[in-house]
UniProtKB/Swiss-Prot annotation:
Binding site for heme b 1: 107, 209
Cofactor binding annotation: Binds 2 heme b groups non-covalently with two histidine residues as axial ligands. Binds one heme group covalently by a single cysteine link with no axial amino acid ligand. This heme was named heme ci.
Similarity remark: Belongs to the cytochrome b family. PetB subfamily.
Membrane topology value: Multi-pass membrane protein
Matches recorded under Gene3D superfamilies: Cytochrome Bc1 Complex, Chain C
TM spans (from-to): 39-59, 97-117, 123-143, 193-213
Protein name: Cytochrome b6
Function statement: Component of the cytochrome b6-f complex, which mediates electron transfer between photosystem II (PSII) and photosystem I (PSI), cyclic electron flow around PSI, and state transitions.
Amino acid sequence: MFTKEVTDSKLYKWFNERLEIQAISDDISSKYVPPHVNIFYCLGGITLTCFIIQFATGFAMTFYYKPTVAEAFTSVQYIMNEVNFGWLIRSIHRWSASMMVLMMILHIFRVYLTGGFKRPRELTWITGVIMATITVSFGVTGYSLPWDQVGYWAVKIVSGVPAAIPVVGDQMVELLRGGASVGQATLTRFYSLHTFVLPWLIAVFMLAHFLMIRKQGISGPL
């Protein structure tokens, strides 16, 4: 993985004595790749790439977005029309969101059709399903943030769905909305979920997912 010039340098040797860089490098670069692996096994990596793009573009927009019912829509218009390359950043965010969902669905189908969920990879499959649920939640919460007519009514409908659940339904609706009706508290909750809670959750499950794949390797053919 490293060239001879790098491994012979004093700086590399200094770090290698303390961090065992060479052992880590050998482990990363020497993993066995089964001969049946094809391009469809890259769908999970493409989904991760889309998530990284989402994180970067979303982080950039937080500098200008204002999560209030009075200023949310105006701030989105400001990003699109006034911020340098703001229109491009937001467009990439939207396109990569759609691409992430599509790649995730195809990845799930690939894993299911090739039996990648079977023993001993049940936990890998479970973490993947949890991440799929979180990804859908990203879409639901992000859809509301522009606080336009589409976003407002989408939130009103989605947050009202739990009302059909017996006993606790009304309490769940009030928890989601932050009150009896959709308003500032709702937008604040959805913004917090979209930019803080869900990213941390998916990061934890991604780490567990990748560590298990690394430990168990790629599943064999059917």
